[in-house]
Amino acid sequence: MGGVRLGDPRLDHFGELMSDTLNRRSFLQYGASAVTIGLTRRVQSVVPPLRNVERGSGGEDDLEETTIAQLQDAMRSGARTAQSICAAYLARIAALDSKLHAVLETNPEALRIAGSLDAERKAGKVRGPLHGIPVLVKDNITTGDRMMTTAGSLALAGNTPPRDAPLVARLRAAGAVILGKTNLSEWANIRSNQSSSGWSARGGQCANPYALDRNPCGSSSGTGAAIAASFAAVGIGTETDGSIVCPSSACSLVGVKPTLGLIEGGGIIPIAHSQDTAGPMARTVADASVLLGALSCHDYSASLDPNGLRGARIGVARKKFFGYSPEADALVETAIDVLKRQGAVIVDPADIPHAGEYDDSELIVLLYELKADLAAYLAQWAPSASVKSLADVIAFNEAHKTTEMPYFGQELFIQAQQKGPLTDQAYRDALAKDQRLSRTEGLDVVFTQQNLDAIVAPTGSPPWPTDLVNGDHFLGASSTPAAVAGYPSVAVPAGYSFGLPVGMSFIGKANSEAMLLKLAYAYEQAAKPRKAPRFLLTADLASA
């Protein structure tokens, strides 16, 4: 693989490279995390200046960890306006994002839009709980404004689509202010199995605000890092397998991977329609519930109950999902004790049949659908782009190797390009296998046999040191069963190991978001697990 090696001047010498290199898991496990706790070299990304950023009028420190309800109270009382809130978040981005590379660009119309929403409020019109609330969205979600939509790729640089994705239109209708676009693993981490999560040619390497040499996971890396750092009230990520829940775990957030189809998927630069979905990323369950409600037109906030764990039957999926990280295991065991103390009935173990048996068929499906779905997206949503197909993107990357492929290649793109149409029997067989083993012979079986309301497991391990030379160091994850089945999962903070976040996932049946959020909220209210990041250079080895 090309790219930098030790001694390259692009490396920042403030630590030792890991002494042991672990085998990297398949890209299908990018809902995973973690490697040994130790110092590493941090690669400094060479990135262009943040587009459109305005410093605003100050007050950014007041916004750290502020919730949607608190912002609404401030606007209702007159202590704040939507415009002053947006200005303060913009100032916070301007002051701190040089450490994270989490935000690709900010919306040049944000302050004007916020001002118009203030005028509505003054006239007695409040659209709902998102009125005047700043939201960051991942850069594979189409916005029909002056911001680009690129999936982090220079192949789509300058692409300003003519209209919003349906989910963005819903946010605007609910009164949200689209504050900016976040960095991501380029092309949502489907280009190479040697990639570094959070790296894109457009944005460089995104860092984790809990320890700047650690990875934020991906592919919704920038949304995770930005919301953890209080660059906006809430954010939107997308997931094919792990891309919401893993960065939520790595950045101590609540991440909701909804049931497939709950949120309209048009206008998202795709990997695969059989698994792709957008979802909320927030610092609290209540905020995630408000955002999911706006995206889906359901009132999930009404389900939140601090006593919601009483009598709930919660299974523990141990096989395949415990044992790869002692730190994650210990923190999740403590979280399970909280569930018990709050009145949940714990069914342990409640293993998921066939977990791990459909990784190969999942990859086949994703590669087939990528080729077809990307061409359809480019035709409908990026008609002025110079690239019209996956083949065009591959050719662009080859012609711009120094900027697009300095660290890793595009072997998954090439494999996808070699696939045939979606009428191929190989694709149909792989899709049928995925759905059978993940749904009817998988999650459906354990939920029915054990009469469960949810299943819990570690989301992943503590964040690993970012390594552009060798790529990500994954040990394990619990994202795949729900991702392949199209069922919901909610990641919540479980605790910290050496100051590094670890999450726990609640996995549910189809369309059980209200139940999962109720359980997650009751856990959160009892455990109070989240701490704000401190932007440390590396892990705090003095803490437990």
Language-model segments: which ranges?
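Structural helix-boundary/capping segments
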Residues: 10, 28, 95, 173, ...
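An N-terminal boundary/leader segment
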Residues: 11-116, 122, 318, 334-337, ...
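Gly/Ser-rich catalytic/binding loops embedded in alpha/beta enzyme cores
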Residues: 53, 57-241, 259, 311, ...
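Acyltransferase
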Residues: 86, 115, 165, 326-351, ...
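Short helix-loop capping/hinge segments that flank enzyme active sites or metal/cofactor-binding pockets
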Residues: 132-151, 308-317, 368-439, 493-501
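Flexible glycine/proline-enriched surface loops and loop-helix/loop-strand junctions
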Residues: 151-153, 206-212, 219, 269-277, ...
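Short, surface-exposed loop/helix-turn segments at secondary-structure junctions
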Residues: 428, 450, 462-480
